[in-house]
Amino acid sequence: MKNLQTHKATQSKGKNMEDVKALEQIDRLTSRFTRTCPSQPEYQERLAEEFEIILSLRFTDYFCQIRDILDLTQDIPHMTRGSAGSSLVCYLMGITDVNPIEWDIPVARFLNPKRDDLPDVDIDYPHYRQEEVMNRIFKKWPGKSARISNYVLYQDKSAKREAAKRLGHKGRLPRKFTYESLGIDPVEAKRIERKLKGKKKCISKHCGGILMFTRQLPKSLISQTNQILLDKNEVADLEHLKVDILSNRGLSQLIDIDPQIKLFEYPEIDEATSSLLSRGDVLGVTQGESPAMRRLFRAIRPQSMLDCVFATALIRPVAMQGRRKAAFFSDWTADRVSDVVVCEDDAIVQIAKLIGCDFYEADMYRRAFAKKNEEKVMEFMTRLGDHPRKDEVFRSLQELSGFGLCRAHAVNLGRLIWALAYQKAHNQKGFWSAALKHCHGSYKRWVYKTEAKRAGLTPTTISKSDKFDDPVWQYKKYGWWSDPKFLPGFYTRHLYLDRIEFAGLIANGRVYKAGNKKYVTFVTLGIDNGYYVDLTINKPFPYSDHDVIRGVGRIKHLNNSDYIEVIESEVLPIDKFYS
């Protein structure tokens, strides 16, 4: 099989037992194809390359098992995430809708003859049907399939709380407490803390990992809920296949809006969608609505679905590091694109180019950087020799230990965000009706309710009471209000030069720890219907238990986005703001 070129070419050579067995395996795969392989040389060569790897690593059963699961759930919409979209065989078998030839994705991230571990296939289903999919699998393969477990370990906070309980504290513990305030001996409590840290606290369910075994499992290993009482490390030596059956609220939202349009059927270019994304008008767009994504969309001004795909990869830590991010925004050129590690596949291509190896060996070095394998990293640096950009390359690849995306995953996620943005641009009511059901993002509840009201929807009626018409009372009790007007009294007022004073309702926030061990707090405030401002506060700021932030800052402008750099501020409960 060393010189395998195409399925047909191999058939003519099937004269010895090895070739006959290989042909049988290829026939098993091709019989499950749901698409016809194009005749162009790049497709035929890629197909031959993948067949050779699959057969040499004996992965035929795995691919057929994934196809069996999809056949079992063909009436349920799905979307494959992860690196499966790197494989032409996966595309032809209908496991993924990403064509790796069209998207120029090397297969090494998914299939690599230098590795003997199974490739990873993750399948997204609507979140409300995840359990149904799992139950179908358990029913189809009883005793041979089970959900994997996670061990929950004691960390700093949980160990501290457990120590307090073991030393006699009853009832709820404050979010921030000291042992002294509870009348507990701190020396003994800290001794218990140290003993607990890193120990098992309990067993939980994996978010979606399903194990498929070739033989019956001992009943002692399986719980009543079909959960194997082992974690991913403990099952490593057992003969099994693993597939992740995951839930995706964005997919649920899109299907709710229009179940007839497939994800890959949305137009790649649409002026209204591009305009919406360029304004950063992405509230309610699941997985694309964070403040960072809003700013990124304003910066790059997506003109197509391809740009949206690019943005989903660029926002990840691997691509969004300091100088490279700033340089990318200021130099939006093809040369700059090829010079930056945006997706993990870019690292493979870059490594192969730098040291003159094939993509498979390059992927092993990529994995070494991602897993912090110092011996393998040093081997790569030695092969790099006296390259003039050696230090820059090392810093760039070191960032692979952060959370990045392979290009195939970015394609699927970017297409989902583009499709949701398309629906928001063309079907506001349908979009917000689905968003209220499925979009559970990081914004406060009132944000989604307010945006839905602006789109013409009437959200669920608030229970009748003698204070029914008071929006502030409704906000305190329910987290939102029914009046179409915004809560009164919030403002931004220009003082002088770049100074501005503000008061707004907290919509979203997050505290980040920078590389210099300093903290920065990002907060989004609502000022009026459809009017939000972003704040940066150069310290950890206790916003989460309050409602309003009021203060003074400097107005800043960067990459088509305005924000306020806070000079002084105070955080208030809503009662105090109105008193």
Where are these regions (language model features)?
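Low-complexity, intrinsically disordered or signal/transmembrane-proximal segments
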Residues: 5-7, 11
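Noncatalytic, beta-rich nucleic-acid-contacting surfaces in large DNA/RNA-processing enzymes
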Residues: 12-579
